[in-house]
UniProtKB/Swiss-Prot annotation:
NCBIfam families: CECR5, HAD-SF-IIA. Pfam families: Hydrolase_6. This is Haloacid dehalogenase-like hydrolase domain-containing 5. PANTHER family: CDP-DIACYLGLYCEROL--GLYCEROL-3-PHOSPHATE 3-PHOSPHATIDYLTRANSFERASE-RELATED, HALOACID DEHALOGENASE-LIKE HYDROLASE DOMAIN-CONTAINING 5. The keyword Signal applies. The keyword Signal applies. Gene3D superfamilies: HAD superfamily/HAD-like. It comes from Mus musculus. CDD domains: HAD_like (cd07511). InterPro entries: CDP-alcohol_PTase-I, HAD-like_sf, HAD-SF_hydro_IIA, HAD-SF_hydro_IIA_CECR5, HAD_sf.
Length: 419
């Protein structure tokens, strides 16, 4: 797809791993498919699976048929998962338990809330900001999500707009008829960017007002403070795939707008105290912990040695999995602990590798030559990753490329001797 021309030449020196696709007619649930022998596979697994959601399991609100077939292989006769599984999504505009219920309904398989890792889930680790007055941007259940992450004092963009009605002036229809300014509004001490908002012009304007005024948008400052207030952001996806034939703008596009405006106005770079969501190492460390805890609860004694990350977006899923694999290799060699999004965390020693598996049912398409060649007049492909992640073409090469998630699960079972 031409819109993804910036994702590097994928699959160079790699193979498109194929297995015969076996469709299950009239699949009624998430039980093992007919004829599938699971007896030998009921041993303690030494691997875990990280599933992206959009473009891998679903397109919009429609389940991809291959996902039903894949999950029929992943459960035993009692309907329990045979291996540890987490769902790692860059979405963040839904509550964790609601996303788990949505997946349960679509996949016809029980998904627990703690198996769902939203883009902002690692914000639970940023304890130093949980008691501060934070402005939150995004959509959906913003306050509920922020409080679930541990933030005790949050202010929404709409609340700020009502307190300072003179700040939001783009939409003539929404301009207030009267100006009742509040003098008792608490100072903002930081900004949470949980996902793309609905009214970008309003959010961009008010976030800038807060940053330029050091949290006092009703007064303003002669000189913008720098460093500015702490900013935590999640979901760096420039694009994402829904029902439309072409990708849609993601939160990464909103972040790009905010960064560009801030630099143009102040001459300085917008800084983040934490960037999370794929491809951040912090998100994969968080997922690794959830996988390990899941295995412990199930009584699986064997340590989890390998992770398989299955996704459709080369820049977030493949880049992130390969970056985490690189981190694991460095840690296993005893090299210095890596900095991860403003936090440092001691990595459990068991996990040794993370393999990236790219599917062709979402952002990436092996059938579209435009997604793998530079546009006319360019030698290189444009980089669709976030500004704070350097462009490393090697990290965009998937360990394996398969057609869909069913083939991905077949590949993993083959690799692990579970087929």
């Amino acid at each position: 797809m031409a819109a993804l021309a910036g994702l590097g030449v994928l699959g160079a020196g790699r193979h498109l791993w194929k297995l015969p696709v076996r469709l299950s007619a009239g699949l009624q649930g998430c039980g093992p498919r007919r004829g599938y022998i699971a007896g030998s596979a009921e041993r303690s697994p030494t691997f875990g699976l990280l599933f992206d959601i959009d473009g891998v399991l679903v397109r919009g609100h429609r389940v991809i048929p291959a996902a039903l077939e894949a999950f029929s292989k992943l459960v035993n006769s009692q309907g329990q998962l045979r291996v540890p599984v987490v769902f790692v999504t860059n979405a963040g505009n839904i509550l964790q338990h609601n996303k788990a219920q949505e997946l349960s309904d679509l996949l016809r398989c029980k998904v627990d809330p703690d198996q769902v890792i939203l883009s902002h889930s690692p914000m639970k680790l940023f304890l130093q900001y949980h008691s501060k007055q934070m402005l939150v941007s995004g959509q959906g259940p913003l306050v509920e999500n922020a409080r679930a992450l541990g933030f005790q004092n949050v202010v929404t963009i709409d609340e700020l707009r009502l307190a300072f009605p003179e700040l939001d002036m783009v939409d003539l229809q929404r301009r207030p008829k009267t100006m009742r300014l509040r003098s008792d509004f608490p100072a903002i001490e930081g900004v949470l960017l949980l996902g793309e908002p609905v009214r970008w012009e309003t959010n961009l304007q008010l976030i800038m007002d807060v940053l330029l005024s050091n949290g006092h948008p009703g007064t303003g400052l002669a000189t913008a403070p720098y460093p500015h207030l702490p900013v935590l952001a999640s979901n760096m996806d420039l694009l994402w795939m829904a029902e439309a034939k072409m990708p849609r703008f993601g939160h990464g596009t909103f972040l790009l707008c905010l960064e560009t405006i801030y630099r143009k106005i102040t001459g300085n770079e917008l800084k983040y105290e934490g960037l999370m969501g794929k491809p951040s190492i912090l998100t994969y460390q968080y997922a690794e912990d959830v996988i390990r805890q899941q295995a412990e609860r199930r009584g699986w004694a064997a340590p989890i040695r390998k992770l398989y990350a299955i996704g459709d977006n080369p820049m977030s899923d493949v880049y992130g999995a390969n970056l985490f694999h690189q981190y694991l290799q460095m840690a296993n060699r005893g090299e210095e602990e890596q900095q991860t999004g403003g936090q440092q965390k001691q990595r459990p020693s068991a996990t040794q590798s993370c393999a990236s598996i790219l599917v062709c049912t979402g952002i990436y398409s092996s059938q579209d030559p435009g997604s793998q060649v530079p546009p006319p007049g360019r030698r290189e492909l444009p980089f669709h990753g976030h500004r704070d992640f350097s462009f490393s073409p090697g990290l965009l090469e998937a360990s394996h490329i398969v057609h869909d998630v069913n083939e991905a699960v077949q590949l993993v079972f083959h690799q692990e001797g579970w087929a």
